[in-house]
Amino acid sequence: MVLEQYFLLLPEFNLNTIRVSNNPSGSAAKPLFMYNRDGSICYYKSTKQVDFVRTFGIHKVTFMKHLEQGTYYLNKYLFSMEELPNAEQSDMTVEQVATMLDIDRVTNNKNKTLVSFSVAVTLINIETKEEHKFPSLGTAVKFLKNGSYPADQRTLVKRINTNIPYHGFTCHKY
């Protein structure tokens, strides 16, 4: 306690000397860019991450993941800290880019499974070699039940990639 009082009362000691990394004001920040998948069009650039988060509704964790790993956001957009020399600046407004992202989110989310741990499977008929692809085990079980088979999801899980027949089908992840 005495040490705290000493530092608080000492006039030349400054407690506000913390340097903020990635300064949110953008004064010392590196520029960030949003390109199309092949990097030929630059849709947006800013020195602040918060602009991408607030303006376009991209979650900060999602933004950082795609920025750091170099993966494509919505399988279409590339975030980068480097300016690509051959990229042309888009003439779209910020509102148009935000609308484009909203439309792509709806389209992309329709193609996703509802549960992140869902397993996409293929059932292959042993006799005809006909393949039936399903986005989840549940839909594969419904298919088997509609074919008058007493199907069970637990048993189907055990048969994935084992080549053990289940009601005339083999089950594989895809």
UniProtKB/Swiss-Prot annotation:
Q: Name one GO biological process term.
A: intron homing
Q: Which domain of life is it from?
A: Eukaryota
Output the Gene Ontology terms for molecular function. Answer: endonuclease activity
Q: What class of enzyme is it?
A: hydrolase
An example GO CC term for this entry is:
mitochondrion
Its primary localisation, in coarse terms, equals mitochondrion
Entry's transmembrane regions: none
Q: Which UniProt keywords apply?
A: Endonuclease, Hydrolase, Intron homing, Mitochondrion, Nuclease
Q: What is its EC number?
A: 3.1.-.-
Q: Where in the cell is it found?
A: Mitochondrion
Q: What does this protein do?
A: Mitochondrial DNA endonuclease involved in intron homing.
User: Which family, according to UniProt?
Assistant: To endonucleases of group I introns of fungi and phage.
What additional remark is attached to this entry? Encoded within intron 3 of COX1.
**Protein name, entry field:** Probable intron-encoded DNA endonuclease aI3
Question: Which source organism does the UniProt entry give?
Answer: Mycosarcoma maydis
Per the UniProt record, the lineage of the source organism begins with:
Eukaryota, Fungi, Dikarya, Basidiomycota, Ustilaginomycotina
